[in-house]
């Protein structure tokens, strides 16, 4: 009898820049305790304001499909704040993942206006991303995969993925 790993013929790694697992697939299997998706209770603090809750809509118009616009910050300082919060630093403790909203509102658009805090907490319904949802339902989804790299911008994160030794 073949083991499960003997049955695997191909591994496909899909990397989506500037979108989190929760944003794209977090609503794929609602209420399934075996899937580490969104529960509907997630939020992120906003310094000096109320916590900003995760949210979704059902619209399929161009504006809804491009939330957040612009993309969240992707430089080292941005990622560090997103993971460890305001003034947080990498260390022995696990990242609190509590700085996404604070980091997003500190960015400004070309017109100098601050970004809307709720935009970075948006997620899609499976119907809004039908192709990737269908692929995820037909194949395995790894919902608890974490890179062992320090916070890095896109280039560093991508090179970590492709440098990985697959066995």
Predicted regions: what is each one?
Residues 1-167:
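N-terminal pro-sequences and low-complexity stem/linker regions of secreted or lumenal proteins
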